[in-house]
From Swiss-Prot:
Gene3D superfamilies: HUPs. It comes from Shewanella denitrificans (strain OS217 / ATCC BAA-1090 / DSM 15013). Belongs to the NadD family. Pathway: Cofactor biosynthesis; NAD(+) biosynthesis; deamido-NAD(+) from nicotinate D-ribonucleotide: step 1/1. This is Probable nicotinate-nucleotide adenylyltransferase. Catalyzes the reversible adenylation of nicotinate mononucleotide (NaMN) to nicotinic acid adenine dinucleotide (NaAD). The keyword Nucleotidyltransferase applies. It is an enzyme of class 2 (transferase). It catalyses: nicotinate beta-D-ribonucleotide + ATP + H(+) = deamido-NAD(+) + diphosphate. GO terms for molecular function: ATP binding; nicotinate-nucleotide adenylyltransferase activity. The gene is nadD. The keyword Membrane does not apply. Disulfide bonds: none annotated.
Length: 216
């Protein structure tokens, strides 16, 4: 199976995660998207909300969309959520699957700062969601890497389908001007204004946040 992996703190999970993931699934004809909540993200500040609540919210989204499955290997680990470690575990547990790790252009620009980042290409394909506002400078090492990988894929043509790892797939996605930080601030300031939140969050996530009084 061809599996997309989308990691994040999901604090909370919102349409800015959900819609691009569905667009990637359709663009690359993936069988499923696995949502992988972080426990201790190594590249940014830790989550504001506890593990159990973030896990429950992701599970709610998975129950609403059969395109998604919950992948809990990172959130159950007490060490930093290094992507290479997670993908090593996944490829060992599911050797029959072909994994596509999904990231935004903002993350791809900084990929060379990630722990053992080059090993990722031995474990999976990389999907780069191209959204407005993020441009790769021609002098960037990542720009060179993307150009080389995309050229290699063009030369290989149909044979790329037989390669289970090592490619970069740029995917144009619809702009989603949504961030978890802004959602948390909005909830804190407005005390759960459903009308304002409904374009940002699924209804069952709004209900969950309200029920458990999160982000107050």
């Amino acid at each position: 199976m061809r599996i997309g992996i989308l990691g994040g703190t999901f604090d909370p999970i919102h349409y800015g995660h959900i819609r691009p993931a569905l667009e990637v699934k359709n663009a690359l004809n993936l069988d499923s998207i696995w949502l992988m909540p972080n426990h201790i993200p190594p590249h940014k500040a830790g989550p504001k909300t506890g593990t159990a609540h973030r896990l429950a919210m992701v599970q709610l989204v998975c129950s609403q969309h059969n395109e998604f499955e919950l992948c809990d290997i990172e959130i159950n680990r007490d060490t930093p959520s290094f992507t290479v470690t997670s993908l090593q575990q996944l490829t060992q547990a599911y050797p029959e699957h072909e994994f596509y790790f999904i990231m935004g252009m903002d993350s791809f620009i900084q990929l060379d700062r990630w722990y053992q980042w080059q090993t990722l290409f031995e474990l999976c394909h990389i999907v780069v969601c191209q959204r407005p506002g993020w441009q790769l400078e021609y002098t960037s090492p990542m720009a060179t890497l993307m150009q080389i990988k995309v050229q290699q894929q063009a030369i290989k043509g149909n044979s790329i389908k037989e390669t289970k790892v090592g490619s970069i797939f740029p995917v144009n996605i619809t702009a989603q001007d949504i961030s978890s930080t802004e959602i948390r601030a909005q909830i804190s300031a407005q005390s759960m204004n459903n009308q304002a939140l409904s374009p940002l969050l699924p209804a069952n996530i709004i209900d969950y946040i309200k029920q458990h009084q999160l982000y107050r």
